Amino acid sequence: QVTVFERDDRIGGLLMYGIPNMKLEKWVIDRKVDIMKEEGVEFVTGVNVGKDVKAAKLLKDYDRVILACGAKNPRDIKTPGRDAKGIYFAVDFLKATTKSLLDSDLKDNNYISAKGKKVVIIGGGDTGNDCVGTCIRHGAASVTQLEMMPKAPDTRAEDNPWPEWPKVCKTDY
């Protein structure tokens, strides 16, 4: 018997709330969860392990406990004005949008809207790009993404011949 405890109200963790629907439609996750349920896996939502249920109880009730808790704490930056209104962490922004989309097709307004806003996203990679795409879908007035990278060369390197794309500028979205 396998039991999965999920902190959120839906199964899937980062796949459910951290990756926008434009990249991963949630019916795919639901289908996988249904297959696991058919195989006997039990899912319990709304349980924050360590807070709602203690390790001692889990060790008493189960033969093995596997921690797959995911990253919950965002990486903050220390800069003057960081605590100003309108600054959000990426995962909070993405999660709120996805939850509102799944709950009400964004009609409940329980998300951080970028509609009509000039948005700057500090950070890159998949998470930064997911924020860019989500802001565009919200109808942001403009979206700028800043990412710390090594300085791009001014000219094409000898080991980067035509017809390959020149490696002089990076744009992810």
Show where each model-derived region lies.
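Residues forming the flavin
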Residues: 1-173
